[in-house]
């Protein structure tokens, strides 16, 4: 079902048929279609959705669509959405909304929720605390497997994940973790204390999100606990949230490799002046660097004038040099981004790149010398000069 078919059903007022079709679709696909519609049509279709599906669709809307819908919703509709949204999705929503919409949302929240929201909004934007959720399954080590399973069945539907459960003491200090798989296959009378893993890998609330992403990549976790400085469990970060972080970091890496200032805004949502500002600084630097190159070439004007054929090889030499530089910088920047290369490795990298460039340079020189002698038919001293350059 695409946007045109949906608009056709709306024009023909076949609302029941449209509702049945939407109920069978994935929430991500519905959100993508509604994002492209005008507000009136999107709101009409959104109100057709079953309540549970509507909440899931809302979580996948673009920030602009979420803002417009919140403005258009009744207080009752907004209250339901906020009650059903996972807490981390609500925080993401609030961080992107203007003050008037934030105030409208806070008015619909309980005093306890407002306290939690204010606490989350105080975390630095790129920290673990800013992307964690408080919806996790919490167990005590004195519980039996039977009691733990009953607790999961009672509270699991409102949690972000139940695959990993977190064991805390009465002060909420993290003591261990246990997977649902272990609970399912263990004896019902066994104690959580005897089954849990007490060597827990965790991150702290103020850790950078790149550090958190590295933990997920290294250990292949579905979720990672987040603790404060007193080792109290404050939340968890799930793999779906860290995937967004990885995508953002990868985008920034590509922008840096292309000599652009990183941008948090998607390309289609960025203004012309903002994009120009990101590019102009590095382009000016490259232009000035090219000016120095021009002066160097000018200083050899007499040589080039006496051996004019050398001029025709300048583009080849510059393009080859530029390409080799791009290859090296791409690999090194990617290594820095993934944590494979660290600052202490700078001399190792320089030594390795020197040996690589020496090997590649010799190979190119031999091939180029043969090409110039056999195809271009130039004199041997010119072939040697160009090849060694």
What residue ranges belong to the model's regions?
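Alpha-helical transmembrane segments and their membrane-interface boundaries
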Residues: 142, 250-389
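Hydrophobic packing positions in regular secondary-structure scaffolds
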Residues: 1-261
